[in-house]
Amino acid sequence: DGVEAIGIMTPSGDHYKIAKEFIKKNIHIICDKPLTSRVEDAKALEKLVKKTKIIFALTHNYSAYPMLREARELVTKNKIGKIKVINVEYPQGYTVAVKKKDEKSTLKWRLDKNMCGPSMILSEIGTHAYHLMRYVTGLEVKEVSAEVNSLSEEISVDDNAFIIVRMDNQARGSIWVS
């Protein structure tokens, strides 16, 4: 009897407006990461969802990988001891292949600040690294410092980030995404 749930797997710049419309219709949502390309939009969606009884699920595909589930289990069962240092590296190369002049690329939207937000590297790749760090360790980030920049003169979005974190158990961590 009608639509019960929808999946949002569009460019991240579209997530907010699509999700907002379906929240208003009380339809359950499965949304690909990142939730939105702007913090303000994410907070607005959270506020809207809290006024409903819908399920709003955000997907992080790598947490389903058996290797990561096993790593999480090792940490959870204290098989490797207390986590003191965390290092996550997630280098990518697709922005090298996608140039502004390449109008045919299906990834071109990732080079548009209006679609992916001010920092493509954090919203599109950093979100994977951040989620994996939290998923495997079970720890929460309490402090963060980052240097974010673009390594390419051909694109206008950030495509490189060095991130330093302090976790809730005082462990230190680093994330490099590029």
List the predicted regions and their residue ranges.
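Beta-loop-alpha module in the N-terminal Rossmann-like domain of NAD(P)-dependent dehydrogenases
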Residues: D1-L48
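Short, Asp-centered acidic motifs that coordinate Mg2+ and/or phosphate
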Residues: E4-A5, V85, R172
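NAD(P)-dinucleotide binding in Rossmann-like oxidoreductases
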Residues: L151-D158, D168-S178
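Short strand-turn motif at the edge of the Rossmann-like AdoMet-binding core
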Residues: K33-P34, T59-Y62, Y90
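A short helix->loop->beta-strand "cap" motif at the edges of active sites that frequently abuts
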Residues: K25-I27, T52-I54, A171
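Predominantly a Rossmann-like dinucleotide-binding segment in NAD(P)-dependent oxidoreductases
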Residues: S63-E147, L151-E154
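Structural detector of well-ordered beta-strand residues that form the stable sheet scaffold
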Residues: I30, I55-A57, N87, R110, ...
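Rossmann-fold dehydrogenase core element
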Residues: A44-Y62, K82-I86
